[in-house]
Amino acid sequence: MAKVCQVTGKRPVTGHNVSHAKNHTKRRFLPNLHSHRFWVESEKRFVKLRISTKGMRIIDKKGIDTVLAELRARGEKV
């Protein structure tokens, strides 16, 4: 399963671990993803999304119906 937020599109980025001796080793910074069920009142059903915590805040602000409309406009199956 891809580590990508369905709402924001956040995905892993690469960087370095830096030791005290300034040695750099490659690492990945992963987004803070959660599988979360949202109740959609207009459809009378739950929708399960894999979203970041930033995505949860966006849903709190805009509302689940607006966010689902944007996802469907992008062609994502929800």
Swiss-Prot record:
Check the record and name the PANTHER family matching this protein: 39S RIBOSOMAL PROTEIN L28, MITOCHONDRIAL (PTHR13528), LARGE RIBOSOMAL SUBUNIT PROTEIN BL28M (PTHR13528:SF2)
Q: Which keywords label this protein?
A: Ribonucleoprotein, Ribosomal protein
List, alphabetically, the GO terms of the cellular component aspect: cytosolic large ribosomal subunit
Name of protein: Large ribosomal subunit protein bL28
**What's this protein's family per the entry?**
Belongs to the bacterial ribosomal protein bL28 family.
Q: Which HAMAP family match?
A: Ribosomal_bL28 (MF_00373)
Output the Gene Ontology terms for molecular function: structural constituent of ribosome
Q: Which domain of life is it from?
A: Bacteria
Query: Region Disordered: start and end of each range?
Result: 1-22
- InterPro entries named in the record: Ribosomal_bL28, Ribosomal_bL28/bL31-like_sf, Ribosomal_bL28_bact-type, Ribosomal_bL28_sf
Q: Which GO terms describe its biological process?
A: translation
The family database entries (Pfam families) matched by this protein are listed as:
Ribosomal_L28
